């Protein structure tokens, strides 16, 4: 559970879902635990439920809110690959959340259009992605750990790697790890381990710098100072653009086509070696961040008008 890495960035919550994460549990088990925990604190409440993104928690809390007759406010609404199996279960989570939500905050024009095609046109707002605000604020504050700053010297050139997607597990991970090993012969690699992928160190070469998950500030520091990124993450596709770093996306689809359209990203599945030079070219098509700016202020302004 990576939530601890974010806890120092936000105020202590009034309610917290307790003991819902367990390694190896099924999606159904997690969903049930979330609903039961939400019942303990929020049943019969009239809170507006704000959910972000497409995680199992976001969808399940949307379902809870619907059953409890609470309004659902969805931030990062309208992202689509149009393939329910990729990513799994995130694509289904966001589709179902959209059809439950009362208010939709979309990051891009593409996401607004995705909702329109599904017949969702009321209370849809194009605001950008809050990740832009988070990135800029954290980088400007410069509150990074001594440990991560010592890991990366001023003239250090490295590639940053993260992998965790459910659809890449088993055979595909091994293929990607073999490619990463090949890349490591000529490039320093910092590989951030993920709790859901415990076997990575069995397959990776000793010369690869394997580190445990870092807090969000340090993660952005590693992104900002990297030479390029190799990942199957969704959020990293946005953070790469904010940092003006290129990213090889180890997937066959993306719900963030703006990263590719702007020249910062490329879908490569497991074919890292053949596409490695993409990270080092300078053909950025559009230097304007497609994910917006001052997003949080826009959202707050709309919420104040909607619920005054």
Q: Where in the sequence are the language-model features?
A:
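Donor-nucleotide binding loops and adjacent catalytic segments primarily
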Residues: 6, 143-225
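Short N-terminal targeting/anchoring amphipathic segment
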Residues: 40-56
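Short acidic-hydrophobic, aromatic-tinged amphipathic segments that line or gate anion-handling sites
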Residues: 15-18, 106, 125-127, 210-213, ...
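A nucleotide-sugar donor-handling region in carbohydrate enzymes
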Residues: 1-3, 97-171
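Leloir-type glycosyltransferase catalytic cores
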Residues: 110, 266-308
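A donor-sugar binding/catalytic signature common to diverse glycosyltransferases
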Residues: 51-52, 59, 63, 74-77, ...
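A short, histidine- and acid-enriched strand-loop-helix "catalytic/donor-clamping" loop
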Residues: 74-88
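Conserved nucleotide-sugar phosphate-binding/catalytic loop shared by glycosyltransferases and other
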Residues: 1-33, 37
């Amino acid at each position: 559970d990576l939530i601890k890495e974010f806890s120092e960035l936000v105020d202590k919550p009034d309610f917290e879902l307790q003991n819902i994460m367990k390694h190896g549990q099924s999606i159904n088990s997690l969903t049930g635990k979330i609903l039961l925990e939400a019942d303990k604190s929020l049943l019969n409440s009239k809170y507006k439920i704000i959910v972000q993104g497409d995680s199992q928690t976001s969808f399940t809390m949307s379902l809870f809110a619907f059953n409890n007759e609470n309004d659902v406010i969805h931030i990062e609404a309208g992202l689509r690959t149009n393939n329910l199996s990729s990513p799994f279960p995130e694509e289904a989570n966001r589709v179902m959340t959209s059809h439950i939500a009362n208010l939709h905050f979309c990051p891009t024009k593409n996401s607004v259009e995705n909702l329109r095609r599904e017949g969702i046109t009321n209370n849809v707002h194009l605001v950008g992605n809050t990740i832009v605000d988070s990135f800029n604020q954290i980088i400007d504050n410069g509150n990074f750990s001594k440990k991560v700053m010592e890991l990366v010297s001023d003239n250090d050139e490295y590639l940053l790697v993260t992998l965790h997607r459910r659809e890449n597990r088993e055979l595909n991970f091994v293929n990607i790890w073999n490619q990463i090993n090949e890349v490591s012969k000529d490039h320093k690699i910092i590989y951030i381990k993920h709790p859901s992928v415990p076997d990575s160190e069995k397959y990776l070469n000793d010369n690869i710098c394997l580190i445990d998950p870092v807090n969000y500030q340090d993660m952005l520091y590693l992104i900002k100072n990297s030479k390029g990124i190799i990942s199957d993450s969704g959020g990293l596709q946005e953070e790469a653009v904010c940092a003006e770093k290129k990213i090889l996306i180890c997937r066959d689809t993306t719900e963030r086509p703006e990263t590719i359209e702007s020249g910062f990203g490329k879908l490569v599945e497991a074919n890292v070696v053949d596409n490695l030079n993409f990270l080092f070219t300078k053909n950025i098509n559009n230097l304007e961040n497609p994910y917006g700016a001052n997003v949080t202020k826009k959202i707050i302004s709309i919420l104040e008008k909607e619920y005054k």
